[in-house]
Each structure stands twice: as C-alpha cells, then as structure tokens.
Amino acid sequence: MLGIAAAMLAVSATQNTARANCRPDGQDDNIMRNAILSEMIAKQQTCQLDSRPHKVLCIGNSITLHLPSNAVNWYSSQGMAASKPELDYCHVLEKLMRQHNRKTTVTPVNIADWERNPSLSLDSLLRDKCQGKDIIVIRIGENVQPDGVANFEKNLAALIDYCKGFTGKIVLTGEYWPHVQKELAIVRNAHKYGLRYVPIDWIWNLYREECSPKEGDTLYDVNGKPYTIKGQFILTHPNDKGMELIAKSIYSIL
C-alpha cells in the first residue's frame, strides 16, 4: 500500500483525471491545492496511537454505512459495497486500532441527507452519536450536489465546528470519487483548523479495477445469506480491497 506521502504525490500526478469534474479554472484549484498540501505534508507526521481505548465516530455517507434498500438491490447493513460488515472500512479501522487496545470502538453514521441538504440540523443528526467520542473522522462530500459545491467549504466548516464541541481530535479524508473543487474545500478546512487530512482519491485513480465490485459479485445480507450485485448503484463503491485501503489510510495518520 502507498504511504501518505506517496498517496499525496499520486493525487498530484493524477489531476488530469479529476479535472474533468471541475470548472474551467480547475487548473488554478489544482495549483492552490498542491501548494497547501506541500505545506501540510511537511508538518503532518504519522501519529502513534497510545494504549488507551478510543471511541471513534466515522461521519460519512453510503461508503461508511448504507442500510438495506430494495430500490438499489442492497440487502446489507454496512459500508457499500463491502461483502460483509467486518470488511467495510469502519470495521477494518476498528480491527487495526484494536492492536493498541482491544476495547477501542469505531461507530459509523450516515449523513448523506445532510450532504444534499446542509440546512438539516446537525444536532438532530449527530448529537447522540458524537457524545463521548474522542476521535471523529469526517468522510463526506460525494453526495454534495453540483449546486452545492460552491458552499461545500463553508458547510464543511460548520460540521467541523460542531464536532469540535465534542473532541479536538478530528480527521478529514478526501473524496473517493475525484473532484478537484470538493477536495480543495476539504484541504482548505484541514489547513484552516490544523486537522489531519488524508487523500483517498488515489485509490480510485490508480486501483479502480481491483477496488471496484463487479456485477455478479457475492455480497451477504443482514442474515448472512449470499446474494449477487445487480444494477449500477453499488458498482461505483469500494469493494473489500478498496475499503481496506481507506481504513489503512485513515489509520496511518491517527
């Protein structure tokens, strides 16, 4: 697996792929993003977890947790498209962190509705989940709609401010599906608040084939019964390998 520095370099090297998703002046966004990243990577060192039990909250979307939905032929309750709960990135992250303390827990929460409609109350969505957590991972952005991209930086800042009311240790990940403007909004917030940040779009850019599920692949439903992937919605999400790389990327900077 690529290290954090190598991953950031990979992101910079694959910007042409991401540019298709940004506005005409996206090249300026790339220059700004890389300048901020260069400063951040010089300061950002791998942190060694202590032996205390940690309570981690992963705030995300369908990549973090998706409940069963007949509408998209998804009958599981984990990060989409992990084949089993224990193989999504939150469970893999928990397993990695339990090497330091077996009582560490990682809890997922899906706020995709807030991504699409940031006027929703964060307190209603997150208060109970955030209570008692000492690490919060914010892993969002893919569901921000085109008309919401311009305000994503401001809305993400509001989410960070809310989470800071519960813990000072907040980690931001980048986008899984490359999008330069959204990524820059995340990087700027990480820089502004002095937060740890890890890009993950290099997984999609460099390892899309091996990290994406295929139609007909086997998944397991909430009762452990196998079923096969049908339809396009699940196919764009990370499979077990992609989930593992996301988990290891987050773990490497905790």
Task: Briefly describe each language-model feature range.
Residues 1-59, 63-82, 99, 179, ...:
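N-terminal secretory targeting modules
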Residues 1-17, 89, 114-115, 128-136, ...:
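Generic low-polarity alpha-helical segments
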Residues 16, 21, 30, 34, ...:
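Detector for Asparagine
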Residues 22-35, 85-97, 118-127, 177-188:
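Short, charge-rich amphipathic segments
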Residues 39-40, 50, 55-57, 65-149:
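Conserved SGNH/GDSL esterase-like catalytic core that processes O-acyl groups on lipids
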Residues 104-109, 114, 243-254:
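Extended amphipathic secondary-structure runs
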Residues 120-253:
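Alpha-helical cap/lid subdomain in secreted, periplasmic
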